[in-house]
Design a protein with these regions (language model features):
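A short beta-strand micro-motif
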Residues: 2-7
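Short beta-strand segments
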Residues: 10-14
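Glycine-rich active-site loops that engage anionic ligands at enzyme catalytic sites
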Residues: 17-24, 28-127
Length: 127
């Protein structure tokens, strides 16, 4: 299933994976929140949910992979180094579930232009 992240005039199209995290987040959509930044990462709160760490949860993500950070109940999108990174990796503060991939990973680098408090919306892309 395709989803879209909208922040200001930037639209990022993604493909949800076939896992429990994606399934639960899709049921909550549309999700509207205000972003926070942490190095080259944005994250934002999601509504109450019961999402748990999946067996393949990880700390290091590739450009284009979308995470759900369980400890913060937040969607996290890394696009470069964070304060936890070693060298040039995209490292979250703790393990997170990989639940979606962007179609154009390089588009995530445009997130650098956004600041704390800016609104974001995540929704299912119309078929």
């Amino acid at each position: 299933m395709d989803i879209i992240f909208e922040i200001s005039d930037l639209k990022i199209k993604c493909k949800a994976l076939n896992n429990k995290t994606a399934e639960k987040l899709i049921k909550l959509m549309p999700i509207e929140a205000k972003i926070a930044t942490w190095g080259n990462e944005i994250y934002f709160d999601t509504p109450n949910n019961d999402i748990v760490l999946e067996n393949d949860a990880k700390e290091v993500f590739n450009l284009g992979e979308i995470a759900f950070w369980n400890q913060g109940s937040a969607i996290a999108i890394g696009f470069g180094k964070t304060p936890a990174s070693k060298k040039d990796e995209i490292r979250l503060i703790s393990k997170a579930n990989h639940w979606a991939n962007t179609y154009k990973p390089e588009d995530l680098k445009k997130l650098k232009a956004f600041k704390d408090g800016e609104p974001i919306k995540v929704s299912i892309l119309n078929k």
